[in-house]
UniProtKB/Swiss-Prot annotation:
GO terms for biological process: phosphatidylserine biosynthetic process. Coiled coil: none annotated. Signal peptide: none annotated. This is Phosphatidylserine synthase 2. One of its GO terms (cellular component) is endoplasmic reticulum membrane. It is a multi-pass membrane protein. Belongs to the phosphatidyl serine synthase family. It comes from Xenopus tropicalis (Western clawed frog). It is found in: Endoplasmic reticulum membrane. It comes from the Eukaryota. GO terms for molecular function: L-serine-phosphatidylethanolamine phosphatidyltransferase activity.
Length: 474
């Protein structure tokens, strides 16, 4: 009886322990699922929001690889077997290229690796990654054409392209109040109130959400205005009035966009991130709210760039600013060398493209710079954005080397040389001279501390010897 009782007690204790262990595993699994996108170690816990997720995995979140493959196969079979091929070579070439791109996009959306973002759906960001690959291949193709063939190839996309742009008058009368115009003295100001004003505001609002730092946004905004001043002898549309540069652009449009962006960042960093499955919410109002929040981030990471903390972070931040400015300049130079008017839909599509890939690229760059333990290589979208920016610049260099090599005015060159020298001087002082000086002082203080400790030990030994001698005499 005693042995059987002992066995029962042991079996009951084992079952209870197994139950507790399974419960703990379940809690850990839910916790890991909820923190799938936000957990990056203890070092980033202060900048990362806490996420609670009930782990619901519905039809919306599944891969659907077989479904996409079936639809794609049926579509290709329909075109092959039931549709008669037209005898138009140009039309067939366009349709074949578009079909090839669509097949690649279907493969990428279902099979490519997920990025750091999961809202509104991971497939959305995989789609834009594949679009960036297609765009880079298109740029490489344009790069390997002659200047004439490349410009005429744009007619293949839109017959209205491939024509030299008409010359326009920029700058002109810069008086805010024109007393010579009796009917409307403020006509110069009203002329600037066009569609580019909300475009500037919206652009910098989105850039602030990408960069998530007020200082970096302001530096990029101000530096681009300096670049416009410096390069207005190359591109006429850079020639603007002083108040258009500093009041309309920097203060009003860019500044207000950055301000609204920072307020949105504050809200995103403070809001709770609690996710429930749609069918687990009892009320219709809660369901509608959940659908709306599907278009907000799954979790939030506050970017702390800290450029002065180390040489690596300083060079990374300088590189980010440089690539940002180069991408901004490419917008204007590509329009100029490929003969695309500013209002063309391809220009707008390029901006929409960078809006969607820029945020992912910035997050991947920040993770690579800030968290090498979990991110040992640069992210795929950041790699593609860097390659696209460089390729666009190479197209500009090849298609119009004369314009881009026009020498800067002497006073502009002096200003840029002075600025570069100041930045290099500060870099050498901050990360070399200052660090060496601080290290030397620290070593010197350590040596002094050791000498003082050795002296105190020696004095203690001498005093102890004297005490022992006194005791011996007594």
């Amino acid at each position: 009886m005693l042995r059987s009782d002992v066995r029962r007690v042991a079996a009951g204790r084992k079952a209870s322990l197994d139950g507790l262990y399974c419960e703990e595993l379940e809690v850990r699994g839910n916790r890991n699922l909820g923190n799938k996108f936000s957990h990056r170690g203890e070092l980033r816990s202060s900048t990362e929001s806490e996420v609670f997720d009930d782990g619901t995995n519905t039809f919306f979140w599944r891969a659907h690889t077989l479904t996409v493959l079936f639809i794609l196969t049926c579509s290709l079979g329909y075109v092959t077997l039931l549709e008669e091929t037209p005898q138009d070579t140009a039309y067939n070439a366009k349709r074949g290229i578009i079909a090839s791109i669509l097949v690649f996009l279907c493969f990428g959306v279902t099979q490519a690796k997920d990025g750091p973002f999961s809202r509104p759906h991971p497939a959305y960001w995989r789609f834009w990654l594949c679009v960036s690959v297609v765009y880079e291949l298109f740029l490489i193709f344009i790069l390997f054409q002659t200047v004439h063939d490349g410009r005429q190839f744009m007619k293949f996309i839109d017959p209205k392209l491939g024509v030299p742009l008409p010359e326009r008058d920029y700058g002109g009368n810069c008086l805010i109040y024109d007393p010579g115009n009796k009917t409307d003295p403020y006509h110069n100001l009203w002329d600037k109130m066009d569609g580019f004003v909300p475009a500037h505001f919206l652009g910098w609002y989105i850039k602030t959400l990408m960069i998530r730092d007020w200082w970096m946004c302001m530096i990029i905004s101000v530096m681009f205005e300096f670049l416009e001043y410096s390069l207005e002898h190359q591109l006429p549309n850079f020639s603007e009035c002083w108040w258009d540069h500093w009041i309309m652009d920097v203060l009003v449009c860019n500044g207000f966009g950055i301000y609204c962006g920072m307020k949105t960042l504050e809200w995103l960093s403070m809001k709770p991130y609690k996710w429930q499955g749609l069918w687990n919410i009892p009320t219709y109002r809660g369901k509608m709210k959940r659908i709306a929040f599907q278009f907000t981030p799954y979790s939030w990471v506050k970017f702390e760039w800290k450029p002065a903390s180390s040489l690596r972070r300083w060079l990374a931040v300088c590189g980010i600013i440089f690539v940002f400015l180069l991408a901004e300049l490419n917008t204007f130079y590509l329009k100029f060398v490929l003969w695309m008017p500013p209002e063309h839909y391809l220009v707008l599509l390029r901006l929409v493209f960078f809006v969607n890939v820029g945020g992912v690229a910035m997050r991947e760059i920040y993770d690579f710079m800030d968290d090498l333990k979990f991110h040992k290589k640069l992210g795929q979208q950041a790699w593609m954005v860097a390659a696209i920016t460089v390729t666009e610049f190479l197209i500009v260099v090849k298609y119009d080397p004369y314009t881009i090599t026009l020498p800067l005015p002497f006073y502009v060159t002096q200003c840029w040389i002075l600025g570069i020298v100041l930045v290099l001087t500060w870099t050498v002082w901050r990360f070399f001279i200052r660090d060496i000086t601080l290290r030397y002082k620290e070593i010197r203080q350590q040596k002094q501390h050791r000498n003082e400790e050795e002296k105190s030990h020696r004095n203690g030994d001498v005093n102890s010897e004297k005490d022992t001698n006194k005791h011996k005499k007594h």
